[in-house]
A protein has these predicted regions:
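Surface-exposed amphipathic alpha-helices with a cationic face
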Residues: 3-18
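Active-site-proximal substrate-binding groove within the catalytic cores of carbohydrate-active enzymes
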Residues: 16-18, 25-26, 32-35, 39, ...
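Single, function-defining residue in the core of a domain
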Residues: 43-44
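Generic beta-strand structural signal
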Residues: 158-160, 197-199, 208
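Generic detection of short hydrophobic beta-strand segments and adjacent strand-loop junctions
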Residues: 175-179, 197, 204-206
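Solvent-exposed beta-strand/loop surfaces of large extracellular or lumenal domains
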Residues: 187-203
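C-terminal beta-strand-rich structural cap/linker in extracellular carbohydrate-active enzymes
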Residues: 200-220
């Protein structure tokens, strides 16, 4: 029923050159995103004021359902406790999976983020820093095959296009990891820091703080 209804809507919109986007996806309906142009969901990464980011497994489920199509978040949280540091972590984690971080309100009705200049002006530097990189990898296109391995279980890798590899330290500790590429590479540049890591036997060494990320541009 859901598939048939969504498919009918898609066909109707395509016939008039319109796009289809659905909130609350995919949920358990993994079969819906292939019919959509854009998927997204409301989310809250705080539990009674404590930081509880979306897990790597949850991100990967959404990304695998959507393939290389756009995915958007609306953060529905208490903006009194979602400080600038947590907003930056939100954007960093979204970058790793090529998803777009947005904001709404704690109760999806009042106290809208973008009606409060104190909030969005505080976070403007984070928007300006991370959104262009998220757009970069999203346009490059997610690839389910990373062609790279990290020697630490705390490290998550995602591939976008032929050039880009995103890296997340999904732990509470600083991690020094070796990332080995299955292709022949000369070096990898972290576009977030400008630092270049020379490769030895197609392997680079990378040090990341807790919940920190890297956006590597691979040079063959």
């Amino acid at each position: 029923m859901v598939f048939a209804c969504t498919n009918a809507i898609r066909k109707k919109l395509l016939s008039v050159n319109k796009y289809i986007m659905a909130n609350g996806t995919p949920g358990v309906m993994w079969f819906v995103p292939p019919l959509l142009d854009v998927s997204g969901t409301e989310t809250d990464w705080q539990l009674q004021g404590a930081w509880h980011p979306m897990s790597v497994a949850e991100f990967r489920y959404r990304r695998s359902c959507c393939g290389d199509k756009p995915y958007c978040f609306l953060m529905n949280s208490d903006f009194n406790t979602l400080d600038a540091q947590r907003v930056e972590k939100y954007m960093k984690r979204s970058l790793v999976f090529g998803m777009f971080p947005g904001f709404f309100s704690a109760n999806a009705a009042t106290g809208h983020y973008f009606e409060n200049p104190a909030l969005y002006e505080r976070d403007r530097p984070a928007f300006k820093r991370y959104l262009p990189f998220i757009k970069l990898v999203a346009e490059a296109g997610w690839d389910p095959i990373t062609d790279a391995d990290a020697d630490s279980p705390a490290i998550a890798l995602e591939r976008f296009g032929k050039e880009y590899l995103t890296v997340l330290n999904d732990s509470q500790e600083t991690v020094n990891t070796a990332i080995t590429f299955k292709e022949n590479i000369v070096s990898a540049e972290d576009l977030l820091t400008g630092k270049t890591y020379p490769a030895e036997n197609n392997t680079i060494s990378l040090n990341l703080n807790s919940e920190d990320v890297a956006l590597l541009k691979v040079r063959s």
